From Swiss-Prot:
Signal peptide: none
Swiss-Prot/TrEMBL GO biological process terms: defense response to bacterium; hemolymph coagulation
Protein name: Formaecin-2
Keywords: Antibiotic, Antimicrobial, Glycoprotein, Immunity, Innate immunity, Secreted
Glycosylation sites: T11
Key word Lipid metabolism present: no
Conditions for induction: By bacterial infection.
Superkingdom of source: Eukaryota
Description of post-translational modifications: O-linked glycan consists of a Gal-GalNAc disaccharide, O-glycosylation is essential for full biological activity.
UniProt-listed Pfam families: Antimicrobial11
One GO CC term, this protein: extracellular region
InterPro entries: Formaecin (IPR012514)
Localization annotation: Secreted
Length: 16
């Protein structure tokens, strides 16, 4: 997965 500065708790990837 990619590092997400917004949502790193519920999901390892950005939920756009």
């Amino acid at each position: 997965g990619r590092p997400n500065p917004v949502n790193t708790k519920p999901t390892p990837y950005p939920r756009l």
